[in-house]
């Protein structure tokens, strides 16, 4: 779960970034949306054994008078997404959802900072708990992921973590006991019903 306030994938070598604006960007999950960010650096003309690896970009599109998207250069992916996926599915964010997402961007940096501070406290607590065998969180000293955070020069590691419950990994009793004791929470004004199904 990353945002541009946490990490900038294009600067780290990614060619295309797909993100959800529903999660961190809105700040409250009140809008549904997403984005595709094209760095414009990917070579869509690559061939293997004389065949195009990406035929949707290199073969003529009859819907657009034989246009070959790869011939357009840097904007090839973004234009293919608009001219194909968006045209065929209508997957455009509504004006209201766009407005709600924009409201959340004002406080994004502050929220990311707080999310990370809270996640680190939870990870540190779990790391010392006798019923936890292992915590997977790059913000912990000694984490095998810490070196990656430092190599990338990231101030934060994100607010998502996982952990393994202590005990025999083949005996799932402790895991089911933990799962059965969980109570779903909501971080918005919304409430969850008493009985939730996954």
What feature does the model see in each segment?
Residues 197-198:
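Glycine-rich phosphate/pyrophosphate-binding loop
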Residues 9, 13-17, 141-147, 188:
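N-terminal start-of-domain structural block
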Residues 1-131, 136:
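Conserved PLP-enzyme active-site core in the AAT-like
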Residues 89-92, 96-98, 107, 113-114, ...:
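Conserved small-domain helix->loop->beta segment predominantly found in fold-type I
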Residues 188-194:
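Conserved small/polar residues in nucleotide/adenosyl-binding loops
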Residues 38-40, 165-167, 194:
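Non-catalytic surface loops within mature trypsin-like serine protease
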